[in-house]
């Protein structure tokens, strides 16, 4: 009888990918990146082991938002003090803090447990075209579709 292969944490090979977010839809990019971070594009994917790769996203400020999301999609946060509810539209976040916009979108697509927090640490988002990971020799990743 054969048993299902399960990857061990020590035998996983990790690559570094760099993705240019210029003009790409936020949701399409986020779902692809979440899949890479989890390792679902690898044949040795194991749900409870971190088999994913590192991802660098550049030009986050040039991400595309379809429809009226720039004005109608609202992100809320609360300071836990009375009257401390603050809100921002997706368009404001894209201009003021584009890294946070992408991170929130990708984080929502990862597991909500300790593995998800570990996977999220492998994501590096930059608003401009420069990044500080040249020593890792990242490959350019072409998005599907």
Curated annotation (Swiss-Prot):
PANTHER family according to UniProt: LARGE RIBOSOMAL SUBUNIT PROTEIN UL13M, RIBOSOMAL PROTEIN L13
Function in brief: This protein is one of the early assembly proteins of the 50S ribosomal subunit, although it is not seen to bind rRNA by itself. It is important during the early stages of 50S assembly.
Family: Belongs to the universal ribosomal protein uL13 family.
Species assigned in the record: Listeria monocytogenes serovar 1/2a (strain ATCC BAA-679 / EGD-e)
GO molecular function, one term: structural constituent of ribosome
SUPFAM superfamilies, A to Z: Ribosomal protein L13
UniProt xrefs under Gene3D superfamilies: Ribosomal protein L13
Pfam families: Ribosomal_L13
InterPro entries: Ribosomal_uL13, Ribosomal_uL13_bac-type, Ribosomal_uL13_CS, Ribosomal_uL13_sf
Sorted UniProt keywords: Ribonucleoprotein, Ribosomal protein
Name of the encoding gene: rplM
Protein name per UniProt: Large ribosomal subunit protein uL13
Subunit: Part of the 50S ribosomal subunit.
Cellular component GO terms held in the UniProt record: cytosolic large ribosomal subunit; ribosome
An example Gene Ontology biological process: translation
Record-annotated membrane-spanning stretches: none
Taxonomy of the source species: Bacteria, Bacillati, Bacillota, Bacilli, Bacillales
């Amino acid at each position: 009888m054969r048993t299902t292969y399960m990857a061990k944490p020590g035998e996983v090979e990790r690559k570094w990918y760099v993705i240019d977010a210029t003009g790409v839809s936020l949701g399409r990019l986020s779902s692809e990146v979440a899949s890479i971070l989890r390792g679902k594009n690898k044949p040795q994917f194991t749900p409870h082991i971190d088999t994913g790769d590192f991802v660098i996203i550049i030009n986050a400020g040039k991400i595309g938002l379809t429809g009226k999301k720039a004005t109608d999609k609202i992100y809320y946060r609360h300071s836990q003090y009375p009257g401390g509810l603050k809100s921002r539209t997706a368009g404001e976040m894209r201009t003021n803090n584009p890294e946070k916009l992408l991170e929130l979108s990708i984080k929502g697509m990862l597991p909500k447990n300790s593995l998800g927090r570990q996977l999220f640490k492998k994501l590096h988002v930059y608003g401009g075209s420069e990044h500080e990971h040249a020593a890792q020799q990242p490959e350019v990743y072409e998005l599907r579709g």
